[in-house]
A protein has these predicted regions:
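ABC transporter nucleotide-binding domain
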Residues: 176-271
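A short linear hydrophobic-aromatic micro-motif
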Residues: 126, 174, 254-259, 290-295
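ABC-family P-loop ATPase nucleotide-binding domain
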Residues: 1-13, 311-320
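ABC transporter nucleotide-binding domains
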Residues: 4-9, 14-210, 215-216
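Non-catalytic surface loops within mature trypsin-like serine protease
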Residues: 31, 129, 237-239, 270-272, ...
Length: 320
């Protein structure tokens, strides 16, 4: 029986002289899953992807792609992987159509099948307007889409993409995210990104890497739940903030903090991410507060990311 685990990274290490870029990391990506690989610059994301795709050797550990050892059988692995490298490199003097034709030739397609593969890739990433233009004349966003087209041309089982929406405008980002969501149904997808909203939009799981180590691996909502403002309640009053409101809120044993904004609203932060919306709405009703809107905040991924990567960086510096 074929396993659902399509990417298996086991105790992977990469050293450059005395510098450790990847430090004994392990994770799996299953069929039908999109894993977002997050981390600050220099964290080890791109190095890990280069090793997984067989473009760089490891210093230790191993990578299995659909059960195949990537180090022992690099060509076999590359046949079943679609890879969008950092910066989406391509031959600048080639036109979009000739470059994709070149990729199709490398992949072994000929005749009608080759033509159809190229057409499908162009249609999926909306490259029709630039197919006869040299790649070096294209905008950063179009170059990225050319790179994405070559990665999906052969309809791979596994997709590995380094910053797939880098340089795209909001509409293009939306289109690419929709495409990734559609493809994720029958593929294993690994993307690296520094765009935290992307994790929330398209990823089933998020892994945060810093200093070459994975410090979080879980669902985006689990990451969001680590935010100090997870389950916080924001109240906007119709006229002004009632004088007694802060006092009444602070005495609640589930409330950690109450902050008033310049715009006349309150942000009520719960202790330990507890859900407090029912208590707040009951109090608002009892006190007859004149409320324009009230809502619960899910939390902010950026503050969680900043907190845990900074803590790890500071701990690392103390040990150097």
């Amino acid at each position: 029986m074929t396993s659902d685990v399509k990417i298996s990274v086991q105790n992977l290490c990469k050293h450059f002289s005395t510098f450790t870029a990847v430090d004994n990391i392990s994770f799996d990506v299953n069929k039908g899953e999109v894993l977002g690989f997050l981390g600050p610059n220099g964290a080890g994301k791109s190095t890990t992807m280069k090793i997984i795709t067989g473009y760089m050797s490891s210093s230790g550990g191993r990578v299995l792609i659909d059960g195949i050892d990537a180090q022992k059988h690099p060509l076999l692995v590359k046949k079943i992987i679609g890879y969008l490298p950092e910066g989406a490199p391509a031959y600048g003097d080639m036109t979009t159509i000739s470059f994709l034709g070149f990729i199709a030739d490398i992949r072994g397609y000929k005749g009608t099948q080759k033509k159809q593969k190229i057409i499908d890739a162009i249609d999926k990433v909306n490259l029709g307007s630039v197919i006869h233009k040299p790649i070096e004349t294209l905008s950063k966003g179009f170059k990225r889409r050319v790179g994405l087209a070559q990665a999906i041309l052969h309809d791979p089982l596994i997709l590995i993409m380094d910053e797939p929406t880098d340089g795209l405008d909001p509409n293009q980002k939306y289109e690419v995210r929709q495409l990734i969501n559609e493809m994720a149904k029958d593929k294993a997808i690994l993307i690296s990104t520094h765009i935290l909203e992307e994790v929330d939009a398209i990823c089933d799981r998020a892994a945060i890497i810093t200093q070459g180590k994975i410090i979080f691996d879980g669902k985006p909502e689990e990451l969001q739940a680590m935010s100090p403002t997870h389950n916080a309640v924001r109240i906007k009053f119709t006229t002004h903030v009632p004088h007694s409101s802060k006092e009444r809120l602070f005495v609640m044993d589930t409330v950690s903090d109450v902050v008033e904004s310049e715009t006349g609203s309150l942000l009520i932060t719960p202790k330990n991410g507890t859900s407090i919306i029912r208590q707040i709405t009951r109090l608002a009703h009892d006190e007859a507060w004149d409320i324009e809107e009230i809502f619960v905040t899910a939390g902010h991924l950026d503050e969680v990311f900043r907190t845990i990567t900074t803590q790890t960086h500071n701990a690392y510096r103390q040990n150097v």
